[in-house]
Amino acid sequence: MVQTKTLTYNSPIEGDVVVTRLDAAINWMRKNSLWPMPMGLACCAIELMASACARFDISRFGAEVMRFSPRQCDVMIVAGTVTYKMAYSVKRIYEQMPDPKWVISMGACASSGGMYRSYSVLQGIDQLIPVDVYVSGCPPRPEALLDALIKLQEKIDKEASLRRLKQSAA
């Protein structure tokens, strides 16, 4: 009878080192290649368009490719007033986006209803979908949107992306 010994290395950090490195690589790729989808619903959309001009250079943050198809984007920028009639469409578009997905609420109207406090206006998009970054202002300047992209990149950098991939695969 032949006995076989298996050599093992018992380390408290075994497995975590590789996962951490892979997480960092995945998060680096995600944060530097954001594909935003503009939901320009009011005057904030003009400032959103201005942020794509050469003066502000949104391409520095890897977000220059604006997609108008929810299946090809990972960041939704809700810019402007959201009415209850429009809310169903916004939620449906959000659900069509592939995971991982993030939302930027741009402007006072998208964040809190703004000056339109009426029966037909949703008082904040966060009542409908989860929001990751808020941009204040009426309308906010393009620099504020660029700052929101930086904040979103910092948030993406801290996520445990590989663990989330394993959970969604199970």
Curated annotation (Swiss-Prot):
Cellular location(s): Cell inner membrane
Membrane topology: Peripheral membrane protein
Chain sites annotated for binding [4Fe-4S] cluster: C43, C44, C109, C138
UniProt KW Lipoprotein keyword: no
Known EC number: 7.1.1.-
Family classification: Belongs to the complex I 20 kDa subunit family.
Key words, A-Z: 4Fe-4S, Cell inner membrane, Cell membrane, Iron, Iron-sulfur, Membrane, Metal-binding, NAD, Quinone, Translocase, Transport, Ubiquinone
Gene Ontology CC terms: plasma membrane; respiratory chain complex I
Record-level GO BP terms: aerobic respiration; electron transport coupled proton transport
Matches recorded under Gene3D superfamilies: 3.40.50.12280
Main localization of the protein described in the UniProt heading: membrane
Subunit field text: NDH-1 is composed of 14 different subunits. Subunits NuoB, C, D, E, F, and G constitute the peripheral sector of the complex.
Top-rank taxon, per record: Bacteria
Functional description taken from the UniProt entry: NDH-1 shuttles electrons from NADH, via FMN and iron-sulfur (Fe-S) centers, to quinones in the respiratory chain. The immediate electron acceptor for the enzyme in this species is believed to be ubiquinone. Couples the redox reaction to proton translocation (for every two electrons transferred, four hydrogen ions are translocated across the cytoplasmic membrane), and thus conserves the redox energy in a proton gradient.
Reactions catalysed according to its record: a quinone + NADH + 5 H(+)(in) = a quinol + NAD(+) + 4 H(+)(out)
Enzyme class: translocase
Cofactor: [4Fe-4S] cluster
Protein name: NADH-quinone oxidoreductase subunit B
A Pfam entry, by short name: Oxidored_q6
GO molecular function annotations of the record: 4 iron, 4 sulfur cluster binding; iron ion binding; NADH dehydrogenase (ubiquinone) activity; NADH:ubiquinone reductase (non-electrogenic) activity; quinone binding
Co-factor binding details: Binds 1 [4Fe-4S] cluster.
